[in-house]
């Protein structure tokens, strides 16, 4: 029996056109296994990585992965995330980005968000609230799906 070896996942860097592309939605029953595998590998290999989007690993799909609890191994995935509401309160924080190594920028973001998204099994989650650093990570990754990166501006 042959074991298929996968190539190491490469992060797309500043200047790659996929980073400025608005990603396409995942459609029902679409196979996203390879994308989920790639996102998981990136987060697992870098303890400082708190989130990554599908286009950062070369896929034009609306999928993100992130660590809901920094320092713990758990990885959360969101498919087709949509921000439905944000809090009026904002805070500033110096953000970094895997696609812009060594660059950081102070970015102001809402402290809370309400999202609709699907999990990787296709189950819909509506009106889910996120606050604090978790909300910040999710917003940063959704920016990537929309072809934007605040760190690059």
Regions found by a protein language model. Give the residues of each.
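Positively charged
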Residues: 1-153
């Amino acid at each position: 029996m042959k074991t298929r070896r996968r190539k190491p996942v490469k992060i797309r860097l500043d200047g790659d056109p996929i980073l400025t592309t608005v990603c396409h939605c995942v459609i029902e029953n679409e196979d996203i296994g390879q994308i989920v595998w790639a996102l998981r590998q990136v987060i697992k290999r870098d303890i400082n990585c708190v989130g990554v989007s599908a286009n950062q690993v070369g896929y034009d799909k609306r999928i993100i992965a992130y660590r809901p609890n920094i320092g713990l191994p758990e990885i959360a995935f969101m498919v087709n995330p949509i921000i439905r509401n944000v809090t009026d309160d904002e805070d500033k924080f110096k953000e970094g980005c895997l696609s812009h190594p060594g660059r950081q920028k102070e970015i102001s973001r809402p402290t809370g968000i309400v999202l609709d998204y699907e999990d990787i099994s296709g189950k819909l989650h509506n009106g889910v609230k996120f606050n604090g650093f978790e909300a910040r990570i999710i917003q940063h990754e959704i920016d990537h799906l929309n072809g934007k990166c605040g760190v690059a501006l």
